[in-house]
Every structure is written in structure tokens, then in C-alpha cells.
């Protein structure tokens, strides 16, 4: 099921008990209650930050297949074609698009 995230500096939270407007809770059993935060800066660059999840967050570069572990408190850029992996059970493909 595609999830559209409006470009904003507030962004959205992803997790089993994600809160806030647009929170994404359609995740696997190994995803933390508040797992990750995704947002867009004022230059339209997208980022993800791990929220001290139990099972980790990984960005897989769509062009190189290089995996980057997202450390809590550190933001990692997201690009179209990348995959965002939350734990072992949940993967999102990063696409650029409009409603």
C-alpha cells in the first residue's frame, strides 16, 4: 500500500504506535512503537532518523545497493529508488511523486 508523505519539515513518524498527523503504523511485528522519523527540508531533500528503535533502520541505496545503518540522532538522506528498511519485516520503496 503506497504511503504519501507531504513535503514538510515536521514530516511523519513511522512505528507500531506512531503518533501525529500522517503517522504510519502499517508495520511488522519487529518495528518499534516509535521507530523512525521521515521529513523534507526547505531544499526538498528527504531524510530519515532512527528514533532509538530496538531492531534498527537501514537505507539501501537504489543505485549502488550500499546499505547505511541509520544511527539514532543522525539523519540519512533518502533518494528516489532507495529502500527504507525498518527491522527485518518492513521495507518501503522511496518514490518521487504527487497525489
Please give the residue ranges for each predicted region.
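Forkhead-associated
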Residues: 4-88
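Short, compositionally biased
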Residues: 92-99
